[in-house]
């Protein structure tokens, strides 16, 4: 029996109006082969733990042979890119293959990135290169390990197909899994095209599939938007707390369910630099690290405008007004956890602000600082103080911090243990990703495999991987990444 017959597969998105997508067959790569396979995620969907155990997996997921249970399609959407509306967007190199149910009965999209040209490719070749595919695979799993809402990576395939970017590279494929691939830009496309019947139908389906609790409400569309605002605020609060810069927060890269989506020129902070720009095409710093909360609101406002045929302006405004309150609440909660604080006290915001100021002024590594702080008590303050150039200012802050901790009436051991569970020892620094890419391009996937294992449990000590916690070398700091992928 074919493996595809044993899985719970469907193609419900293809039941939507055809102006939302185009059926496109994948264009196979040469000599395609597995590079990575996410065993834990595969198990969740009743897929084999070893992809080599069934040749149909490679031929089907790579697009060489399209199983009858698949219905490959490229989605049509629009979006605001760097603040300007662009109606000519869509899946230019990715295809939604099918939807699959996990063991709990939840439905997930299976999306193949790098599958070839589509009607929405514009001048692109429809391919993804190994370099960018490795980055997305690693980062989506790193974000999952950090507990941040994200799409997932099920597998990665390599090939011998040459793909030209700044120079010749090899084509690769990413199997992305997500609860949905509906973006803010889907609603923008229908709204600006004045396709209001289809616009309402998409909203109805999104509520049915992803916000079923809204169905019993008198105004399900307004409740859905409230939920989108809340989830987006929560996602961005997580980004800011862990030091993640997305790099290209266009509305077509915003998930309707608040999951981190479309990993491109992302970066994690090394030194705490609020204005960090990871995308070298972002000349104005629109998507700088410290601008992400503001851009989240801008994008939600764009979505609100696109949903205005369904929701009263007063309801939209009320939801948008809650965004900053929600984001600040989530962020403050996350920072209290990172600092080992249980209760909410009046001076906490100032404690956080003074910490960020001190980190920025002294160019202190953000991840290293919080991990070291997870081991601080009155007997080993010096380890933290030594991270700073201005040691007097650091000593004063540490003293204030310890005084604040003493108000919690919790043992030092208990506090430190909880802090180590939320402050990662390991993050996907750009230089680590680059080292894995360099080796993979030579056919050595050992670094990729090691990082994948490590980033799934970034809070553990992993003594055998200690060197991955090292600060970046000079060449690896403040790397700006191209959108070219």
UniProtKB/Swiss-Prot annotation:
ATP binds at residues 90, 92-93, 113, 125-126, 176, 183, 262. Keywords: ATP-binding, Magnesium, Manganese, Metal-binding, Nucleotide-binding, Nucleotidyltransferase, Transferase. Its EC number is 2.7.7.-, 2.7.7.108. The active site is at 252 (proton acceptor). It catalyses: L-seryl-[protein] + ATP = 3-O-(5'-adenylyl)-L-seryl-[protein] + diphosphate; L-threonyl-[protein] + ATP = 3-O-(5'-adenylyl)-L-threonyl-[protein] + diphosphate; L-tyrosyl-[protein] + ATP = O-(5'-adenylyl)-L-tyrosyl-[protein] + diphosphate; L-histidyl-[protein] + UTP = N(tele)-(5'-uridylyl)-L-histidyl-[protein] + diphosphate. GO terms for molecular function: AMPylase activity; ATP binding; magnesium ion binding. InterPro entries: SelO. It holds the Pfam family SelO. It comes from the Bacteria. Its cofactor is Mg(2+); Mn(2+). Mg(2+) binds at residues 253, 262. Belongs to the SELO family. Nucleotidyltransferase involved in the post-translational modification of proteins. It can catalyze the addition of adenosine monophosphate (AMP) or uridine monophosphate (UMP) to a protein, resulting in modifications known as AMPylation and UMPylation. This is Protein nucleotidyltransferase YdiU. It comes from Aliivibrio salmonicida (strain LFI1238) (Vibrio salmonicida (strain LFI1238)).
């Amino acid at each position: 029996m074919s493996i595809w017959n044993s899985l719970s597969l469907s193609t419900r998105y293809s039941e939507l109006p055809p102006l939302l997508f185009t059926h496109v067959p994948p264009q196979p790569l040469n000599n395609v082969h597995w590079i990575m396979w996410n065993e834990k995620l595969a198990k969740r969907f009743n897929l084999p733990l070893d992809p080599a155990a069934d040749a149909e997996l490679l031929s089907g997921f790579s697009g060489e042979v399209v199983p009858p249970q698949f219905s490959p399609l490229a989605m049509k959407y629009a979006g605001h890119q760097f603040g300007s509306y662009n109606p000519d967007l869509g899946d230019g190199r990715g295809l939604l293959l099918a939807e699959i149910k996990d063991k709990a009965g939840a439905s997930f999209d299976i999306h193949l990135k790098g599958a070839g040209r589509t009607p929405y490719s514009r001048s692109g070749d429809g391919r993804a290169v190994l370099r960018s595919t490795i980055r997305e695979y690693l980062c989506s799993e790193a974000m999952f390990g950090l507990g941040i809402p994200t799409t997932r990576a099920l597998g990665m395939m390599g090939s011998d197909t040459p793909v030209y970017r700044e120079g010749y590279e090899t084509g690769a494929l990413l199997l992305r899994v997500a609860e949905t691939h509906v973006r803010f830009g889907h609603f923008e496309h229908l709204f600006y095209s004045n396709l209001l019947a289809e616009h309402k139908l998409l909203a109805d389906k999104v509520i049915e599939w992803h916000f079923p609790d809204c169905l019993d409400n008198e105004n399900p569309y307004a409740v859905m938007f409230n939920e989108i605002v809340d989830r987006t605020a929560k996602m961005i609060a997580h980004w800011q707390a862990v030091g993640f810069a997305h790099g290209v927060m266009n509305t077509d890269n915003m998930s309707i369910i608040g999951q981190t989506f479309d990993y491109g020129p992302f970066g994690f902070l090394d030194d705490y630099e609020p204005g960090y720009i990871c995308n070298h095409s972002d000349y104005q710093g629109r998507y700088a690290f410290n601008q992400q909360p503001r851009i989240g609101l801008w994008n939600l406002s764009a979505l609100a405008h696109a949903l205005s045929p369904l929701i009263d302006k007063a309801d939209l405004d009320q939801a948008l007004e809650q965004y900053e309150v929600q984001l600040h609440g989530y962020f403050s909660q996350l920072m209290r956890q990172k600092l080992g604080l249980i209760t909410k006290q009046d001076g906490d915001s100032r404690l956080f602000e003074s910490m960020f100021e001190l980190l920025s002024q002294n160019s202190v590594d953000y991840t290293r600082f919080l991990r070291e702080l997870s081991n601080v008590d009155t007997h080993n303050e010096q380890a933290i103080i030594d991270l700073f150039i201005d040691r007097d200012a650091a000593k004063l802050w540490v003293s204030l911090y310890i005084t604040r901790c003493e108000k919690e009436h919790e043992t030092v051991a208990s506090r430190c243990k909880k802090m180590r569970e939320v402050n990662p020892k390991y993050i996907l620094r750009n230089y680590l990703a680059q080292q894995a890419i360099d080796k993979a391009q030579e056919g050595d996937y050992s670094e990729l495999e090691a990082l994948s294992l490590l980033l799934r449990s970034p809070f553990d000590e992993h003594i055998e991987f200690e060197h991955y916690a090292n600060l970046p070398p000079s060449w690896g700091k403040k790397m700006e990444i191209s959108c070219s992928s």
